[in-house]
Amino acid sequence: MRVRDSRPPFAGLANLSEEQLHRLPTPCYLLDEAQLRRNGEILLGVQQRTGCRILLAQKAFSNFNVYPVLAPYLAGTEASGLYESRLGREELPEKENHVFCAAYRADEFEELLQYADHIVFNSPSQLAKFGPAAKAAGKSIGLRINPECSTQEGHEIYDPCAPGSRLGTTRAQWDAAVAAHPELPALLDGLHFHTLCEQDADALAVTLAAVEEKFAGLLPRMKWLNFGGGHHITRPGYALDTLESCILSVRQKYGIQVYLEPGEAWALNAGYLVTTVLDTLRNGDTSLAILDMSAACHTPDVIEMPYRPPLLDAGEAGEKTHTVRLGGPTCLAGDIIGDYSFDAPLAEGDKLIFGDMAIYTTCKNNTFNGMPLPPIWLLGADGNCRELVHFGYQDFKMRLGAQ
């Protein structure tokens, strides 16, 4: 069953003219500079009012050509491993560089120390293995904790607090590790939890209470606490007052720095995927349209999560006169984007614009079936469009072998 997308639909692209839309190749990703800046202003305001530091989780959005747009607003980057950490260091050398990985590789760790300022470990065993080297290199060291507090509904695949989770250390696991290795606490500078996914601040408040209940004895000894990501801070209606109360409470109670590392919040509603109808057909009672984009290749979360992305000038199935199932051109039978309704029938050559396509798209797409990677364009704050990067046959071929 598809999860209904809770993100707000968009009513239009104010800065994009019909002429520019006509010139865009399809499929293509179109990043929106003005919306990136609007998101940045919101996140900067939270930092200014609370003293927290907000990082960009590059796993969600790593289009480094627009890092200069975000640079005035962010404190640094968060990485999931060596390559993202290097990207953050290369493109934002003056900003903080944080990294968390479920398990680090010994053959990569020395290089990682060149890029990261803060290194968060997932388990006491990883802390014991790599912590001394990180400490000797002058890094700030953290441990990801599992407060065993699930607040998610509808997409348990993203719940790090699910039973048997591999992510984070429970209090029982920590106590057992310290009993066997009393030197571990001296390595720690901070704690990190990441339990949310596209959620409001009420879920954070519940989670924070669980963190304090289970780990209160450790917090006064820490220098920082990282609230992780999954905070939909820039979504209309998000409870900023609740978020800021949570941050200020921790800072005042424990005298420590607070970090947040959202990914989606930086680029929420700041990108589009422009596509063209290749064919229309009917199977029984179902009207279908084949697009030149693929859910499986270009928007994997549509299938993985799953969710139904917003589409400009379209309604829910049955809401408007003509309901159509939109799908991609690959051989995967489930390469379906969703059912939408329109005021008029779709025709070959029609252009469609999906919204909120900056996040978890360009960083997750693939070339299954030999599908080309869409080029990435930028809609500038001045209303002009320009291509940031173009992909071709060699990008497909050279992922699969060498000449």
Q: What are these regions, as identified by a protein language model?
A:
Residues 57, 194-196, 225-234, 262-265:
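Glycine-rich beta-strand-to-loop/alpha-helix junction loops that act as flexible
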Residues 18-24, 190-194, 228:
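A short small-residue
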Residues 149-151, 197, 233, 266, ...:
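Feature marks short, surface-exposed loop/turn motifs that line or immediately flank catalytic pockets
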Residues 246, 257-403:
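Charged (often Lys/Glu-rich) extended helix/loop segments that serve as interaction or gating elements
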Residues 5-104, 108, 294, 342-348, ...:
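N-terminal capping/small domains of soluble enzymes
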Residues 205-210, 239-245, 275, 341:
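Charged helix-capping and loop-helix junction motifs
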Residues 49-224, 246-249:
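Active-site-proximal beta-alpha core segment in soluble small-molecule metabolic enzymes
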